[in-house]
A protein has these predicted regions:
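HotDog/MaoC-like acyl-thioester-processing domains
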Residues: 4-22, 27, 92-93, 97-180, ...
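Hot-dog-fold acyl-thioester-processing enzymes
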Residues: 6-92, 157-239
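Short, glycine/charge-rich beta-strand/loop segments that flank catalytic centers
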Residues: 54-56, 245-249
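Residue-level signal for alpha-helical context at structural boundaries
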Residues: 129, 206-209, 245
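Phosphate-handling active-site elements
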Residues: 119, 233-240, 268-269
Length: 297
């Protein structure tokens, strides 16, 4: 976890500003048009039905559609015949917001490698790699900073999946609200189409089984987007300053997801005045699939 300090159990992020010191390698820039139809497709993929003038909190992930170097898109003319895109374990995702993304604007994305670090865990040596994306408006002002964190583990991604399936389940905590009911493969595909993440492990059943998985599974970012609905239902879009968390377990076809949003009171930093929250998401068996923190203005 990075980008701020802990207040209790909640991380309060610093102001959103582009920072050249946070890149660990070359970056590239490209345009990100925020089109009404694209936002509506994203909304429908996460269970919303009404058009909105602001994009959902995790819509910035859809920059992948416009990134000319994005790797989780089938190569033209060969599909995945030359092998799958690199499949590391997506363990964390973080968004810092200066303001909501507005339908109709065109942003400039700068994308590249961020921080790198290592540690030793129960599954062996772990190498963490951060991908950083900064979105700026036509005035050059920061709008959103997004950080995707992968881990390279000694154990395979499929082996780690089996370990997750073997975890002991707990009773679903009280106060949870349903954010998705009996997720289907169709919804996985809807999200892939809206977000631009076409990794075949999320939609190609035969391929997933050949690579050691029990079935296709939901993109982690779909779980996060569904969780964000519970947060914005409570605090709205305009107040949101940060939203980030860790993926604890995969989500499978047929799962129903429940989220709990807990407010922890006001933050005590003058440059981050607002409220701090934790957000946890569970499946129908009480298994923790995602846990996050958020702050508001």
């Amino acid at each position: 976890m990075g980008g701020g300090e802990l207040i209790g159990t909640v991380r309060v992020v610093n102001a959103v500003q582009p920072n050249d010191d946070l890149w660990s390698g070359p970056t590239h820039d490209f345009s990100f048009p925020v089109e009404a139809g694209h936002v509506l497709a994203f909304l429908r993929a996460i269970g919303e039905t009404d058009p909105q003038t602001v994009a959902p909190p995790t819509f910035a992930a859809a920059t992948d559609h416009f990134d000319p170097h994005y790797l989780r898109r089938p190569p033209r003319g060969s599909g995945w015949g030359n092998g799958l895109p690199e499949s590391n374990l997506h363990v964390e995702q973080h968004f810092d917001y200066a303001r909501p993304v507005q339908v109709g604007e065109t942003l400039t994305a700068r994308k590249g490698p961020g921080r790198r670090w290592s540690k030793t865990g129960r599954s062996g040596a772990l190498q963490f790699v951060e991908e950083r994306t900064e979105l700026r408006d036509s005035d050059g002002d920061a709008v959103v900073v997004m950080r995707w964190v992968d881990v390279h583990a000694e154990r395979s991604h499929a082996d780690l999946t089996k370990a997750q399936l073997d975890r002991v389940r707990v009773v679903l905590p009280p106060g949870a609200v349903v954010v998705a009911e009996q997720l289907s493969r169709t919804q996985f595909v809807m999200y892939a189409g809206a977000s631009g993440d076409f990794h075949p492990l999320h939609h190609d059943e035969d391929l997933a089984r050949r690579h050691g998985y029990p079935s296709v599974f939901a993109p982690g970012m779909l779980t996060m987007a569904l969780t964000a609905r519970a947060l914005t239902d409570l605090v709205g879009h305009e107040r949101l300053r940060s939203f980030g968390g860790r993926f604890r377990s995969q989500v499978w076809p047929g799962d129903t997801l429940h989220a709990i949003v807990t407010e922890h009171g006001a933050t005590d930093r003058p440059d981050a005045a607002g409220s701090a929250f934790t957000v946890t998401t569970y499946n129908q068996n009480g298994g923790l699939v995602f846990e996050a923190t958020a702050t508001t203005r």
